[in-house]
Amino acid sequence: MASQSQGIQQLLQAEKRAAEKVADARKRKARRLKQAKEEAQMEVELYRREREQEFQSKQQAAMGSQGNLSAEVEQATRRQVQGMQSSQQRNRERVLAQLLGMVCDVRPQVHPNYRIAV
């Protein structure tokens, strides 16, 4: 009986060691997967930064020529607005006088289509 008990104990210990090895293997696998995921994430982030930097440089090159153009358009717009404002200041009094003259100087007239009923 003692040999059977000893054999069972050996089997239980072997099963326990096997379970520990399987658990260790699972932990190592989980660590490797986590490390691979982190490395992949870092690589993706590095690639994204490179592409973003490349995009920024191309955009800067394209906008450099447009930057001068937009500055010229901005300056032309300012000149036109200043011209309109000065024209408004010059003609303001004359236009107000015309408007007030049309509103205040009413000349009563009979409408040409009006027929006098007899």
UniProtKB/Swiss-Prot annotation:
It is found in: Apical cell membrane. The modification N-acetylalanine is found at residue 2. GO terms for biological process: synaptic vesicle lumen acidification. Its main location: membrane. Residues 55-90 are annotated as: Disordered. Residues 56-69, 78-89 have a biased composition (Polar residues). The keyword DNA-binding does not apply. One of its GO terms (cellular component) is synaptic vesicle membrane. GO terms for molecular function: ATP hydrolysis activity; proton-transporting ATPase activity, rotational mechanism. Keywords: Acetylation, Cell membrane, Hydrogen ion transport, Ion transport, Membrane, Transport. InterPro entries: V-ATPase_G (IPR005124). It comes from the Eukaryota. The keyword Mitochondrion does not apply. V-ATPase is a heteromultimeric enzyme made up of two complexes: the ATP-hydrolytic V1 complex and the proton translocation V0 complex. The V1 complex consists of three catalytic AB heterodimers that form a heterohexamer, three peripheral stalks each consisting of EG heterodimers, one central rotor including subunits D and F, and the regulatory subunits C and H. The proton translocation complex V0 consists of the proton transport subunit a, a ring of proteolipid subunits c9c'', rotary subunit d, subunits e and f, and the accessory subunits ATP6AP1/Ac45 and ATP6AP2/PRR. Subunit of the V1 complex of vacuolar(H+)-ATPase (V-ATPase), a multisubunit enzyme composed of a peripheral complex (V1) that hydrolyzes ATP and a membrane integral complex (V0) that translocates protons. V-ATPase is responsible for acidifying and maintaining the pH of intracellular compartments and in some cell types, is targeted to the plasma membrane, where it is responsible for acidifying the extracellular environment. Belongs to the V-ATPase G subunit family. This is V-type proton ATPase subunit G 1. It comes from Canis lupus familiaris (Dog). The gene is ATP6V1G1.
